């Protein structure tokens, strides 16, 4: 493994874990998914063209691995298991309820919208990067994020409006500060 490839791989691991958590909604499954995606990337390292978007390449590998695993698991069971530890945290009961409500709302979003929202809002991906990582058109990526924001606003505030990236990031940061745990891990 070349130094640059290795450095990029190490740097992207936290963002891959966030994406994996948004897809699997389970910490152990997310860790397994990231590990499998890294193994796949190492095996396919020769196919990566230096100078191209490494982040999009890795997110695509992770997403494809998730889809493959999902197809295999479809025959044996459902992956909709959310461990109680995903909702646990330190802080007042009310604050935990707010985090739980946000996590439940995120979990109710369709997988493609949840993934798009996490990658754009939490990880700061551009719409172009999101489109490349998920294999969809830029317009589709934008509409997924828009629909996810609007649906969250409806569920959380009881009104149909769009949550801006700034509002959503601010809400997540306030929740993180109150509870003292990474909110993205709850998704």
Where are these regions (language model features)?
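Helix-turn-helix DNA-binding module
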Residues: 107, 111, 123-140, 154
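Internal acidic/polar
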Residues: 68, 76-102, 126, 168-182
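Residue-level preference for hydrophobic side chains embedded in well-ordered alpha helices
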Residues: 8, 12, 16, 20, ...
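Arg/Lys-rich amphipathic alpha helix in sigma70-family domain 2
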Residues: 49, 60-81, 95, 147, ...
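A short pre-motif secondary-structure segment
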Residues: 116-120
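A short, charge-rich alpha-helical start-of-domain segment used by transcription regulators
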Residues: 1-18, 28-31, 42, 54
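C-terminal edge and immediately downstream basic/flexible tail or linker adjoining helix-turn-helix-like DNA-binding
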Residues: 4, 133, 150-187
């Amino acid at each position: 493994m070349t130094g640059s490839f290795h450095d990029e791989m190490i740097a992207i691991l936290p963002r891959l874990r966030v994406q994996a958590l948004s897809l699997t909604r389970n910490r152990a499954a997310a860790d397994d998914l990231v590990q499998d995606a890294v193994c796949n990337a190492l095996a396919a390292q020769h196919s990566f063209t230096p100078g191209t978007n490494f982040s999009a390449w890795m997110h695509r590998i992770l997403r494809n691995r998730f889809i493959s695993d999902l197809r295999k698991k479809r025959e044996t069971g459902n992956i909709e298991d959310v461990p109680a530890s995903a909702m646990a945290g330190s802080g007042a009961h009310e604050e935990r309820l707010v985090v739980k409500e946000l996590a439940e709302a995120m979990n109710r979003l369709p997988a493609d919208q949840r993934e798009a929202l996490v990658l754009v809002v939490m990880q700061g991906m551009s719409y172009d990067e999101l489109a490349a990582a998920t294999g969809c058109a830029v317009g589709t990526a934008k509409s997924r994020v828009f629909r996810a924001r609007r649906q969250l606003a409806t569920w959380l505030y009881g009104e149909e409006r769009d949550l801006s990236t700034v509002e959503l990031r601010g809400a997540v940061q306030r929740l993180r500060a109150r509870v003292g745990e990474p909110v993205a891990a709850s998704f």
